[in-house]
Amino acid sequence: MAAELPPYTHVPGITPHPIRDPAGHAYGKAIPRCPKPTIADWQSCWPLKEGRTLFEAGYYWEAHETWELAWATAGRHGPIADLIKGLIKLAAAGVKLYENQPIGVERHARRAADLFDIARQELGDTALGYSIPALIGIANDTAIKPPERSALPPGTPAPLLSLAKAHA
C-alpha cells in the first residue's frame, strides 16, 4: 500500500488524533491487512515498508501505528515480532522528541536497543531489510544523545531520527 504523506504528524494532546477525531488525517479510512512477515518474504508486508517511509520523513506516530500492524500480523511474539517492536519503540522515542519529554525518549530508545539485541540473537545480523547491529547503534545513540527538537510548529514533521545507516 503506497500512501501519500499525511498533512501533519500526530503529537498526542496537540494535534487531532488521526483515527478517532473526525478532523484526523486517517479518520474513517480502511486499513488493509498484510501477510505475515517472514525473513524470506518480508517485502510483501506493506506496513514494514510504509513504516520506514513514514519514519524517515519524521512521521513517528504514524510509523509507530503502521509498524504495529506488522507486529500484530507477526504474532506479537518471537524474533521477527521483537525486531518490529524495536522499530515501534524507536518511533515512540521520536514522538517523545516532539513532546519534549527527554526521559521518554531515553526509555523508549533503550527498550528498542534491547529488543533489537534479543532479535539479533535468533535472526543474525540482518533481517527485514535492516542491519540489526546498526539499529542497536541508532537506538543507543538516541538514548545517550537525542537530537535537538525541531523549532517547527507542532505537527510539522522533522526527520530528527534516521534508519538510513541500518538499511541492508
Regions found by a protein language model. Name each.
Residues 1-75, 118-168:
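N-terminal alpha-helical interaction modules that lie
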Residues 52, 87, 92-94:
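Residue-level recognition of tetratricopeptide repeat
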Residues 64-67, 80-83, 103:
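Short acidic alpha-helical/loop segments enriched in Asp/Glu that coordinate divalent cations
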